[in-house]
Amino acid sequence: MKVWMAILISILCWQSSAWAVCPAWSPARAQEEISRLQQQIKQWDDDYWKEGKSEVEDGVYDQLSARLTQWQRCFGNETPDVMMPPLNGAVIHPVAHTGVRKMADKIALSLWMRERSDLWVQPKVDGVAVTLVYRDGKLNKAISRGNGLKGEDWTQKVRLISAVPQTVSGPLANSTLQGEIFLKREGHIQQQMGGINARAKVAGLMMRQDDSDTLNSLGVFVWAWPDGPQLMTDRLKELATAGFTLTQTYTRAVKNADEVARVRNAWWKAKLPFVTDGVVVRAAKEPESRHWLPGQAEWLVAWKYQPVAQVAEVKTIQFAVGKSGKISVVASLAPVMLDDKKVQRVNIGSVRRWQEWDIAPGDQILVSLAGQGIPRIDDVVWRGAERTKPTPPENRFNSLTCYFASDVCQEQFISRLVWLGSKQVLGLDGIGEAGWRALHQTHRFEHIFSWLLLTPEQLQNTPGIAKSKSAQLWHQFNLARKQPFTRWVMAMGIPLTRAALNASDERSWSQLLLSTEQFWQQLPGTGSGRARQVIEWKENAQIKKLGSWLAAQQITGFEP
């Protein structure tokens, strides 16, 4: 019962998310956006299938194709799930290529597996599909996948690939095999190295007119033997004996989705001889080959890896002012998952950097995780037809502005509060940006230290602050009064590192105000430029006013 409930919840969540990502476009706008992306994908298809080149990463192509399908569903212009590649060859496949249906997640895979037995998992090798036809023990023909029914004659090319056996015997002497021509790799770790655009590279090599030695950089992984031995173990043994050893090495029996998940995760992290983009689970029992048709395979499914980088739609562009007054640009995204992390925002950087990227709401950007799991922009992969970019705020802020609240200072003022509450400054646990905004909106702070005057009753009656949390906050605010003098000076934004400030041995506000530029310049890591900044800072009227206010509050080091 619990399993079926989990499946139902998964389906409902998927449906909800599917509807949620439908753009709020007029019919005319939808038609224009869909048409433009259709034309681009068609151009990429023509480049790939006819010329063997790719102007776009495989993962980006796959995700934008899925995005196009989603838009078509949203606006009633849905096309069949299986998109047939353009016909660019007249050689008929002895057995049609069926393609493989993708499973959304482990729950969907588990549901599919419950109805089947004698199941096996293989890596979903990333390359180009091929048919190998053997007659009387010799390689008779090699055919590109094409549209699944017909393809190009690749016989001469494949004969130059040393990894493909040219002669076979026994049951394989008169057989038709289907597999993947792949780019041979040494110790490829998918988790670290990604897809390296392997599919397009293989297609390019196979499309070249010259019979280059580079074809020996290709290998083959046979994943189907239509009308072959009934037992999978017999199939694998015969294939290995003939020279198709990879199939036996990388085909494992599985009983449930948990076992598939373990193998999938192991291959994701292991050193493999090829690039992969997931796993394929297949039943050993297959229908007769005469029943195989494109898009009709019910005996196998794929469970793809989550891409290292995801295509995300930009919903809004927002501007943030940091404590130093610098304006940064943040893109709010339609949520995507990256390595089990839900990503909804990505920092673009400065206004100039944003203008160089030329990013507007509605654009599609490629996002990945940098060090420490921080989202980053890798590329702008698609720009919308209608592009309206917001106007950035005037650059009127600097490191000495917005210690006191005002309408124009809202963002920098909040940034200063977030900074002073951080662990490395006053260590106010339990309050972040949202909490500071709630306090300031309710109590209208005069300056960055006004929170010291809040009473337990005021905190308890602050909308957005839970009553159970208000007592904890009041306790934190009181503890802050006992923080060392240097922590309070850091909270005031002195332009020095903590190491330099500690080395100064300043222990009172009056002593600090008397220190000269020469004194500051001799501190570690503090040059003449930084020393002048310290002088400008301590002579600033807002800073002097804050120092006097803290003295009135009898904060350590500020007392007269």
Curated annotation (Swiss-Prot):
GO terms for biological process: DNA repair; DNA replication. InterPro entries: DNA_ligase_AS, DNA_ligase_B, DNA_ligase_CS, DNAligase_adenylation, DNAligase_N, NA-bd_OB-fold, NAD_dep_DNA_ligaseB, NAD_DNA_ligase_OB. The active site is at K124. Its EC number is 6.5.1.2. Keywords: DNA damage, DNA repair, DNA replication, Ligase, NAD. It catalyses: NAD(+) + (deoxyribonucleotide)n-3'-hydroxyl + 5'-phospho-(deoxyribonucleotide)m = (deoxyribonucleotide)n+m + AMP + beta-nicotinamide D-nucleotide. It comes from the Bacteria. One of its GO terms (molecular function) is DNA ligase (NAD+) activity. It holds the Pfam family DNA_ligase_aden. PANTHER family: DNA LIGASE (PTHR47810), DNA LIGASE B (PTHR47810:SF1). Catalyzes the formation of phosphodiester linkages between 5'-phosphoryl and 3'-hydroxyl groups in double-stranded DNA using NAD as a coenzyme and as the energy source for the reaction. Belongs to the NAD-dependent DNA ligase family. LigB subfamily. This is DNA ligase B.
